[in-house]
Swiss-Prot record:
Belongs to the YqgF nuclease family. Gene3D superfamilies: YqgF/RNase H-like domain. It comes from the Bacteria. Its EC number is 3.1.-.-. GO terms for biological process: rRNA 5'-end processing. Keywords: Cytoplasm, Hydrolase, Nuclease, Ribosome biogenesis. HAMAP family: Nuclease_YqgF. It comes from Sulfurihydrogenibium sp. (strain YO3AOP1). The keyword Nuclease applies. This is Putative pre-16S rRNA nuclease.
């Protein structure tokens, strides 16, 4: 079974999460440095986890508009498409508030390196949002009359 990869694109680091094989839960992975080897590392994840889709957080403004970071994310995705298999579907998910949710969650723990963990935890929230929507839409289809 294939899995879904969740990414939170940042200028320095990329938060990473992966779904379970059934597409129910998202689990954080170690962040990736956004450097010259970033596409190679993402390709390794695609191969190792048998990824069929990538869900990427799109950082919209509070008004729902695309700002500078959203434009950077879209540009990153255009470059990513040139480095991954063409059959991998890429989906954007509104990521407003995921970083603040991740920060609040980590404040309740005593983990070290919180800054690095926020990136992958944000990726978990991004991916889990997508998985929950997918599950809800499947349930609605299965229970329609």
């Amino acid at each position: 079974m294939s899995r879904i990869l969740g990414l939170d694109i940042g200028l320095k680091r990329i938060g990473v999460a992966v779904s379970d094989p059934f597409g129910v839960t998202a689990t954080p992975l170690e962040f990736i440095l956004n450097d010259e080897k970033v596409f190679e590392k993402i390709n390794d994840l695609i191969k190792n986890y048998k990824i069929s889709k990538i869900v990427i957080g799109l950082p919209l403004t509070l008004k729902g508009e695309e700002g500078e970071q959203a434009r950077y994310t879209k540009e990153f995705v255009e470059n990513l498409k040139n480095h991954i298999p063409q059959d991998i579907e890429i989906i954007f998910v509104d990521e407003r508030f995921t970083s603040s949710l991740a920060e609040k969650t980590l404040l309740q723990t005593k983990k070290k390196n919180k800054k690095e963990k926020i990136d992958s935890l944000s990726a978990v929230f991004i991916l889990q949002t997508y998985l929950d929507r997918l599950s809800f839409s499947n349930e609605a289809t299965n229970y329609s009359y």
